[in-house]
Amino acid sequence: MLQLSSSLEKNLAALNARFGASADFYAKRIELYHCPGAIVLFDNMASLESLWSLLLDAATRHTPSLEPERMPHTGTQVYDLLMNHSGLPAEDGPVKDMDDLIRRMTAGMAVLLLDGCKKGLVFSVQGLKSRSVEEPSGEGNLRGSREGFADLLRVNLSLLRRLIRTDTLVMETAQADCAMKTEYAICYCKDKASKTAVARVRRTLQEAKPEGLLDSSYFVPWLFPARWRLFAPVNYTERPASAAAKLCEGKIVILVNGSPSALVLPSLFCENFDCLDDYATTAVFSSFLRVLKYGSFYLSIFLPGVFVCLAVYLPELIPPQLLFKIAAAEKATPLPLFAEMLLVIILLEIIREAGLRMPQTLGHSVSLVAALIIGDAAIGAGLLSTPVILVASITASSVFVTPSLYEPATLLRLGVTLAAGLAGPVGLVCAALGVLAALTSISAMGVPYLSGAVFSGDGVVRRNYRALSRRPFTIWQRRGS
């Protein structure tokens, strides 16, 4: 670690060697109390207007009142005057080494270096341009806060602090060990979160060495190192209100600078089926919606496989009138039912991906038009049958009821359809048992992934909110349940 030198020229030479070729590097030589100095910062990250206003105000306010014998003559004396005897809003911790200096500058701060002083004075004059606080597009709700996380870490931390206004909320910041040196924060309530879990998360993130850190999801492979895991015991939210609710349950929230997505851990399987609106409606209607979500999730996984299994291997279980229509439709198509279903599933994923990656103003229209044209043309040309298109459409609609489970649901749907098409009822049963085994084998920091779905009072069926409030709940109470 390179310590700052008492020579201003050496410090500037070290900075110029690193950032001299960068157009945004700003270094301005000044003189304070007849002492040579320099202001260093990155342009457009720190506000030059605010900085010069602070320095000029300090110089004009304090210089006339100083007696000649108290006038500073060395860099150390000037530093002491500005730090301890002026009204400058400087940061408490001085800069003593080059790595810390660069970290402060890349955070949008300005640093004053003085000749003859081995410390730098830091000013928080950030002038970063960023996206304002907006409503997140991926988490719709009817009631409650409309605010969403922004891209700046400090803004997101302030949103959480505004919601949890107690001394129990702890927000630890650190810098990732990667080339980008991205700042992240670990947030938890010290009276509810498990100290062991917090220590484990802190240690894991310190030891993690990603190539770059652009989102909180980059930490998941280090927190839960499983190579072939479909379900991860984590969740994501872009709503400060949702993150605050999870913190009050004893969970840990990880925020990364530059990303509005907060990583919540540990997370349970049943939490993919609830939302903030569940607690703003009656318990009966909330329970109905949750049952509907569970049904939609399993429908999105098993419906194509069950349809292929019944139509190909067990046609006697289908009502005769429906069976005759399916047989007539399949007779007019050149592909077998199994291949037809796989083709439609893959086509729908291609259309969805195309709509997602296109500009927002065109994405929805392109997806809708492409689905209608391809479906109508395929049926008209006799390439695909109407029952297959109908089953695939129901499946595609069902998967969006639980967007947080979209990725595993898509892969499992393909796997179940393959198993049902190749091995019939045996393959379908084996696939269902495989899904169940995958879910039961997951443990979220000692808490079973499937816990709380039935007997917790806030699982598939929810009790009324008053009854839930009478017994404070944290996720660590489910350990080993």
What are these model-derived regions, one by one?
Residues I254, S267-G415:
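Transmembrane alpha-helical segments that form the functional core of multipass membrane systems
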Residues R165, K331, G424-P425:
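Amphipathic alpha-helical protein-protein interaction surfaces
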Residues L32, D57, K118, D177, ...:
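Flexible domain-boundary/linker segments
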Residues M1-F302, E316, P320, T440-S481:
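Membrane-embedded alpha-helical signal segments
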Residues T386-V388, S393-S481:
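Hydrophobic alpha-helical transmembrane segments of membrane transport and translocation systems
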